[in-house]
A protein has these predicted regions:
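Helical segment within the ABC ATPase nucleotide-binding domain
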Residues: 73-85
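Hydrophobic anchor residue at the start of the ABC signature
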Residues: 47
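A short, surface-exposed alpha-helical micro-motif characterized by mixed small hydrophobic
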Residues: 99-101
Length: 141
């Protein structure tokens, strides 16, 4: 039984190393607890956990909140790679530049109701703000 356990542990270590390389995790030791990492690297650990599962739809709520610009860029790269590889990503964000830069389609909600759905091709900050001020029935709130 110890032999089988050692094989599983070695496979887990190999998988962890591959995932850390894939997400470009900056950690001095692969066995370091995520709580000892920077906020950006903690977010990367979350992505590594997602990549270790065979998921095709990801719902990300404020994936870059509270992390520095360099870490945000790294998270955006990971998200773009996932989208290129067929993952569907639903991102919730309150950061306008993030929405404009990352989304293919934007759904604006106000008071729990959809007030606008827009393709990103010609999307502007003003259009998003206009929809965020509308009620779900189409009138000004």
């Amino acid at each position: 039984m110890l032999f089988r356990s050692a094989l599983n542990e070695q496979a887990e270590i190999t998988t962890a190393i591959e995932l850390c390389q894939k997400i470009q995790l900056k950690a001095s030791d692969i066995s370091a607890p995520p709580s000892s990492l920077s906020g950006g690297n903690q977010q990367k650990v979350v992505f590594a956990k997602l990549l270790n599962r065979d998921l095709k739809v990801l719902i990300l709520d404020e994936p870059t909140k509270g992390i520095d610009v360099g870490a945000k860029y790294s998270i955006y790269e990971i998200m773009n790679e996932l989208a290129t590889n067929g993952y569907a990503i639903i991102m919730v964000s309150s950061e306008m530049p993030e929405v404009l830069g990352m989304a293919d389609r934007v759904v604006v909600m106000r008071n729990g109701r959809v007030s606008g759905i827009m393709e990103n091709k010609e999307l502007t900050q003003e259009m998003i703000l206009e929809h965020s001020l509308k009620s779900a029935e189409g009138g000004e709130a």
